[in-house]
Amino acid sequence: IIYRVVRLSEEKDMDEFQKGKLYLCATPIGNLEDMPVRAIRLMKEADVIAAEDTRNSIKLINHFQIDTPMTSYHEFNKYDKARALVDRMLKGETVALITDAGTPGISDPGEELVKQCVEADIEVISVPGPAACINALIISGLSTRRFCFEAFLPSDKKERNEVLNELAAETRTMIIYEAPHRLVKTLTELMNILGQDRKIAVCKELTKKHETVFRTVISEAVDYYLSLIHI
C-alpha cells in the first residue's frame, strides 16, 4: 500500500512537471527601450508566442532578434485558440503571451487564456513591464491613492449609459481609454455626468517623442479638443 501511494505521488509529480507554463510578457507601449530584458529571454525560450496581432508584433520580434514561432490570439478567436494553447501547455510546451502594446490581460483577450490556464491548473507567470493605464495614472497629477480602471466604455448605447450612470457617483480617480476620433464625444458625456469642473488629465503618445499630458478640467478639455477639430 505504501509503495502504491508513493508511486501515485510520483506519477502526479511527473504530470505536474510535464505541464508547460504561460508567461504574460509586457512589451513597450511606444518606446522600444522599455522592453523588459526578462521578457526578451522568455520569448526566445518559449515554444510559441501568442500575439494579438502578428503583423504588428513582427516588428518587435525582429528588432530583438527573436525567432520563436508566432500564432495569432485575438478577440475573435480567443475561445477556440485559448483551448488549443492550453492543450499545447498540457503537453509540456511553454507559451509567451503578448499584446499589441503594454501588459497582456488588461482589457484584452489575454484574460480568457489566463482563465482557461487556471482552470487547467497550468502555472501563469507575470513578466512585468509597461502598462498604459498605470503610466498615465502616475504622471496625471491626480490622486493615485484610490482609483478605478474602466478601459474603453461600451459602444452599445444602452450599456454605455448604464456605465456612465454608475460613474456619476464615482469619487476615485478613473482611468478610461479612448480613441482620438471619439475623444470629444466621450469627454462631453463625462462632463454631463461629472460636472464641468471635474479635474482631468488627457494623456497621449505615452513614452513616445511627442508624449503630451493635458491637465485641466473637463469643460476646458472639451473646448480645447473641439477647437482642434475646427482648425
Annotate each predicted stretch with a short phrase.
Residues 112-170:
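Class I SAM-dependent methyltransferase SAM-binding "motif I" and its flanking Rossmann-like core
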Residues 85-124, 128-131:
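Glycine/small-residue-rich loop that forms an oxyanion/phosphate-binding "nest" at active or ligand-binding sites
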Residues 229-231:
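Conserved small/polar residues in nucleotide/adenosyl-binding loops
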Residues 5-6, 10-13:
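Acidic, Ala/Val/Gly-enriched low-complexity intrinsically disordered segments
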Residues 29-32, 100-104, 180-182:
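Short glycine-rich anion-binding loops that position phosphate/pyrophosphate groups of nucleotides
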